């Protein structure tokens, strides 16, 4: 089975990263911000996998495992913060929560 060309894989990773960055800057809902961060991390992981496959090195797979474990830790901590924020302020809007004191 032929491998995906390096340029195509990196282009997809770049597009995914840009989509995640736009979602991070545009959306005000914390849940969507966390999802955008996950998309950006997966784009970086895809770039590692494609680059590692191009040169036949296992380093890309090792970095992928590290990125996935970091993403899991980020998701668990982020969701815990999200739940506490919703319980305290009854909103998931970043701007509304940052203006409230308590």
Curated annotation (Swiss-Prot):
It is an enzyme of class 7 (translocase). Pfam families: Oxidored_q2. Keywords: Cell inner membrane, Cell membrane, Membrane, NAD, Quinone, Translocase, Transmembrane, Transmembrane helix, Transport, Ubiquinone. GO terms for biological process: ATP synthesis coupled electron transport. One of its GO terms (cellular component) is NADH dehydrogenase complex. GO terms for molecular function: NADH:ubiquinone reductase (non-electrogenic) activity; quinone binding. It is found in: Cell inner membrane. The keyword Ligase does not apply. The chain crosses the membrane at residues 6-26, 30-50, 62-82. It is a multi-pass membrane protein. Its main location: membrane. It catalyses: a quinone + NADH + 5 H(+)(in) = a quinol + NAD(+) + 4 H(+)(out). Its EC number is 7.1.1.-. The keyword Membrane applies. InterPro entries: NADH_UbQ_OxRdtase_chain4L/K (IPR001133), NUOK/Mnh_C1-like (IPR039428). Belongs to the complex I subunit 4L family. NDH-1 shuttles electrons from NADH, via FMN and iron-sulfur (Fe-S) centers, to quinones in the respiratory chain. The immediate electron acceptor for the enzyme in this species is believed to be ubiquinone. Couples the redox reaction to proton translocation (for every two electrons transferred, four hydrogen ions are translocated across the cytoplasmic membrane), and thus conserves the redox energy in a proton gradient. NDH-1 is composed of 13 different subunits. Subunits NuoA, H, J, K, L, M, N constitute the membrane sector of the complex. This is NADH-quinone oxidoreductase subunit K.
């Amino acid at each position: 089975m032929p491998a995906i060309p390096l340029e195509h894989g990196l282009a997809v990773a770049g597009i995914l990263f840009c989509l995640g960055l736009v979602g991070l800057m545009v959306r005000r809902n914390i849940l969507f911000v966390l999802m955008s961060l996950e998309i950006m991390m997966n784009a970086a992981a895809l770039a590692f996998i494609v680059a590692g496959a191009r040169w036949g090195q296992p380093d890309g797979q090792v970095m992928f495992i590290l990125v996935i474990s970091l993403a899991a830790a980020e998701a668990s901590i982020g969701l815990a913060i999200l739940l506490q924020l919703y319980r305290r302020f009854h909103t998931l809007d970043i701007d509304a929560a940052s203006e409230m004191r308590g």
